[in-house]
Regions:
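Class I S-adenosyl-L-methionine
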Residues: 1-165, 179
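Signature of the SF2 helicase/ATPase Hel1-core->accessory helical subdomain module
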Residues: 101-105, 189-190, 194
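Conserved SAM-binding motif I beta-strand of class I
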Residues: 171-173
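Conserved SAM/SAH-binding beta-strand->alpha-helix loop
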Residues: 176
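Conserved SAM-binding loop
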Residues: 183
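Coupling/hinge elements of helicase-like and P-loop NTPase modules
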Residues: 194-208
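AMP-binding/adenylate-forming catalytic domain of the ANL superfamily
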Residues: 210-213
Length: 217
């Protein structure tokens, strides 16, 4: 949100650009993305879910009756096939809200999984005050500790989930080159929050995400 306020101060007076408050972008992303996810599963699976709660039930039933890893893999593929574009991306606030919401959705559907399609069953992800929050079964906040195997698994999972969504699902265009730069920076910062150590001294390399955020009219 600080980047968004800077964006408004720098550009707003010149071209009428305004920062969208976090509670608005959070509400918009939650209401729209959840409906789109339900529609996409209905389209691909031939289901007739009317609500997100019905979708949760259908996925859990399929997990119980079929190969769990295959179900989780397909469900992730369906969500990762979504394409969300903001044609006036500004500082990227809406795209960040969508990024966090998609991860929260995967967590609620119990398909937020590591590279082996094993779920992060001991933690739940949700969006609070426009921030992605991860808590354990006792309500404790997740904190990354590289020497802890489970903590490392969770951090790597969140990093790669964000990377996948940023590279495949999120697109933005803006006529203002400064806003494009801020949007790119904002997405990089979201990814950096879950950067992890490949060994004791080396952090995982951040990907090139410029391809999805373009300057244009």
């Amino acid at each position: 949100s600080v980047l968004g306020l800077i964006f408004e101060k720098v550009n707003g007076y010149k071209d009428g650009s305004f920062f969208t408050p976090g509670f608005i972008s959070m509400y918009m992303s939650r209401e729209t993305i959840r409906r789109v996810v339900v529609q996409k599963f209905n389209e691909v699976k031939g289901w007739n879910c009317k609500t997100f709660e019905e979708l949760k039930e259908d996925i859990q039933e399929e997990i119980k009756s079929s190969n769990r890893k295959d179900v989780r893999k397909e469900a992730n593929r369906i969500i990762n096939s979504l394409k969300i574009i903001d044609p006036a991306v500004g500082s990227g606030h809406f795209l960040v809200s969508v990024l966090n919401e998609l991860i929260a959705i995967k967590s609620e559907l119990k398909i937020l999984v590591d590279d082996n399609y094993e779920p992060l069953s001991s933690y739940s992800a949700f969006v609070l005050n426009d921030e992605l929050i991860l808590i354990d079964e006792e309500g404790g906040l997740f904190s990354y500790h590289p020497k802890n195997k489970e903590s490392q698994r969770i951090q790597e999972t969140l990093f790669h989930e964000k990377q996948t969504i940023i590279e495949n699902c999120l697109f933005g265009v803006d006529i203002n080159p400064n806003s494009v730069k801020i949007c790119r920076l904002r997405l990089w910062i979201e990814l950096l929050k879950n950067a992890y150590y490949k060994n004791q001294t080396e952090l995982e390399t951040l990907p090139n995400i410029d391809i999805n955020i373009k300057c244009g009219n």
